[in-house]
């Protein structure tokens, strides 16, 4: 079992229940999924860029990403409908907790000039989105083998009903908020 999953089940559930004043342990919010998204701007002109992004995402997430395609043509961006423009991965279960552990314990401390995540990035329903500017903060990505620096979006979807519940959950997992 993943370290953070067992920590959540054994200690954090009770701690969050008391902190939020919930009556039942089943009301305690939990993380349902983590979605990683990497948009590759120049993928419409150069197919190799997308292959590099897929390789990086596979190394980071531990599973093969699905290639995202443009929903409609936009002349200003020089893309057509159905052209590949990025990739995404949805993590659930054990892999989700393993990724969260690596994110909190290894990747976040390696971010340059990091002063904590903004508490304003909650969506009103307890879900949290954050952006990572460089994929090299993850130890799985070999610095010598990358073709360019890419960023990614990380969305943590929770079962929380409000931002306060979501913040309490992520703080218990060790997320550094400002």
UniProtKB/Swiss-Prot annotation:
This is Large ribosomal subunit protein uL5. Keywords: Ribonucleoprotein, Ribosomal protein, RNA-binding, rRNA-binding, tRNA-binding. Part of the 50S ribosomal subunit; part of the 5S rRNA/L5/L18/L25 subcomplex. Contacts the 5S rRNA and the P site tRNA. Forms a bridge to the 30S subunit in the 70S ribosome. The gene is rplE. Belongs to the universal ribosomal protein uL5 family. InterPro entries: Ribosomal_uL5, Ribosomal_uL5_bac-type, Ribosomal_uL5_C, Ribosomal_uL5_CS, Ribosomal_uL5_dom_sf, Ribosomal_uL5_N. GO terms for biological process: translation. The keyword Metal-binding does not apply. Disulfide bonds: none annotated. Pfam families: Ribosomal_L5, Ribosomal_L5_C. The keyword Ribonucleoprotein applies. The lineage of its organism: Bacteria, Pseudomonadati, Pseudomonadota, Gammaproteobacteria, Moraxellales.
């Amino acid at each position: 079992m993943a370290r953070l999953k067992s920590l959540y089940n054994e200690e954090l559930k009770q701690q969050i229940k008391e902190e939020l004043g919930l009556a039942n342990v089943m009301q305690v919010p939990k993380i349902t999924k983590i979605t990683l998204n990497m948009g590759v701007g120049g993928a419409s002109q150069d197919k190799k860029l997308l292959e590099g992004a897929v390789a990086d995402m596979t190394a980071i997430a531990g599973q093969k990403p699905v290639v995202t395609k443009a929903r409609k043509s936009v002349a200003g961006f020089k893309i057509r409908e159905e052209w590949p423009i990025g990739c995404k991965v949805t993590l659930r279960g054990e892999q989700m907790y393993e990724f969260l552990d690596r994110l909190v314990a290894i990747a976040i401390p390696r971010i340059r000039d990091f002063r904590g995540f903004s508490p304003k990035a909650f969506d009103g329903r307890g879900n949290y989105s954050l952006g990572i500017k460089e994929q090299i903060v993850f130890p799985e990505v070999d610095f010598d083998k990358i073709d360019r620096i890419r960023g990614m979006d990380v969305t943590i979807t929770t079962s929380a009903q409000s931002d306060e519940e979501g913040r309490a959950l992520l703080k218990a997992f060790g997320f550094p908020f400002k």
